[in-house]
């Protein structure tokens, strides 16, 4: 795992709002999976940067509860209307071309899985040393 990937995973975890994004490309093909921070600004940056390249993006929390669903770059389903309003505050200027999407706190899902496996291994090694 590269140092910048490890750093990004730790930055996502420091937001205390991590979840998963599933990006479905136009014309089919394999979906792309990401772990990302679920802050309104980060969600807007992710959707604003990737939304028009994807037919659909589904974002869930770590318990697989729907946070937001997009269709062709537009918010479609957002169960928490307060969160939806906060996402729109950041997303609308991006969609209107008034500003570029900012930094996105996200890594591919396999990178996150590798990080957690590495973390589990370190915990196991520490426990073995205590014996």
Feature annotation, model-predicted:
Residues 125-131:
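Non-Sec secretion/translocation targeting segments of pathogen effectors
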Residues 22-34, 38-106, 110-111, 116-123:
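Acidic, low-complexity, intrinsically disordered interaction modules
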Residues 14, 18-24:
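A short beta-strand micro-motif
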């Amino acid at each position: 795992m590269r140092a910048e990937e490890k750093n990004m995973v730790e930055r996502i975890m420091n937001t205390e709002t991590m979840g998963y994004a599933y990006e479905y490309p136009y014309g089919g093909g394999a979906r792309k999976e990401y772990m990302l921070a679920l802050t309104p600004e980060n969600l807007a940056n992710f959707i604003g940067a990737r939304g028009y390249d994807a037919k659909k993006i589904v974002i869930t929390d770590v318990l697989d509860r729907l946070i937001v669903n997009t269709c062709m770059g537009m918010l479609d389903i957002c169960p928490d209307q307060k969160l939806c309003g906060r996402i729109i505050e950041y997303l609308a200027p991006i969609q209107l071309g008034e500003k570029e999407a900012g930094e996105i706190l996200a890594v591919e899902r396999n990178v996150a899985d590798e990080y957690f496996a590495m973390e589990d291994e370190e915990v196991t090694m520490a426990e073995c040393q205590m014996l």
